[in-house]
């Protein structure tokens, strides 16, 4: 049987990638935080997941956008990560679905992120935005299109992908990365319809709420964070995960390093309130 690491993310058919990505994420679901209730809930984009920790200390909810290079992933593939975020932040996390490529081309995803967020805000005074990888960019697309921007308390972008391909990190880790290679990154942007990143980057919010940029040190797209920080007016806090690769937070519940990093992310979030 094909294993997750045997997949060719640059050339394999997307349905195959989705199948085995889902299986891989299902295999770690048992590492989810045991004292967090997980249930289905509805968004303007469809059915997603709600994570309710046993201990709730803060009333401001987190709206979460999952990663997966815009071609794979769902709230279900990020159950483990979101459950630990909910536990450590002591607040509810809502993971929303969104349209994937190549069936849906950009800017569908960016526009949908704004629609989801505006709908989510209709019944809330304040929210926090968080997302990883592709979702780390989706939160900035969401923030750019929010009608009531003062309702966004903060934004946490976890090893976000912002359309860069030529930095030092891309050259250093692009060929030997376990979780993300440059060939796969180019393929993902192509599936999205964004071989030219300028249209994609133009959809990212450039001002507003405090922004946390979490960078995995051994990640090909680590330099994307520096590129964004140089161009944004968001108040930026940098967090570097030493020795970690892309998507390392999927190891929460099974890695002391991932857990420690998620605790720091939760602390940053909670210090905003």
What name fits each language-model region?
Residues 1-54, 273:
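A glycine/proline-hinged amphipathic helix-loop "lid/cap" segment
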């Amino acid at each position: 049987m094909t294993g997750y690491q045997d997949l060719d993310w640059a050339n394999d058919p997307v349905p195959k990638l989705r199948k085995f990505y889902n299986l891989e994420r299902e295999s770690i679901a048992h590492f989810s935080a045991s004292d967090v209730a997980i249930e289905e809930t509805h968004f303007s984009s469809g059915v997603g997941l709600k994570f309710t920790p046993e201990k709730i200390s803060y009333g401001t909810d987190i709206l979460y956008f999952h990663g997966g290079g815009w071609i794979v992933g769902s709230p279900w593939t990020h159950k483990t990560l979101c459950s630990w975020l909910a536990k450590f932040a002591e607040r509810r996390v809502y993971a929303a679905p969104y349209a994937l490529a190549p069936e849906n081309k950009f800017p569908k995803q960016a526009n949908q992120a704004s629609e989801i967020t505006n709908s989510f805000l209709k019944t809330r005074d304040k929210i926090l935005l968080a997302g990883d990888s592709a979702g780390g960019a989706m939160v900035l697309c969401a923030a750019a299109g929010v009608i009531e921007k003062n309702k966004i308390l903060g934004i946490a972008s976890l090893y976000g992908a912002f359309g860069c391909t030529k930095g030092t990190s891309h050259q250093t880790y692009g060929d030997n990365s376990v979780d993300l290679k440059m060939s796969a990154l180019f393929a993902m942007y192509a599936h999205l319809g964004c071989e030219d990143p300028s249209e994609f980057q133009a959809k990212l919010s450039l001002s507003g709420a405090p922004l946390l940029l979490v960078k995995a040190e051994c990640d090909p797209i680590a330099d994307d964070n520096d590129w964004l920080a140089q161009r944004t007016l968001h108040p930026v806090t940098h967090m570097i995960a030493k020795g970690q690769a892309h998507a390392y937070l999927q190891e929460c519940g099974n890695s002391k390093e991932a857990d420690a990093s998620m605790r720091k992310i939760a602390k940053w979030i909670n210090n905003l309130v």
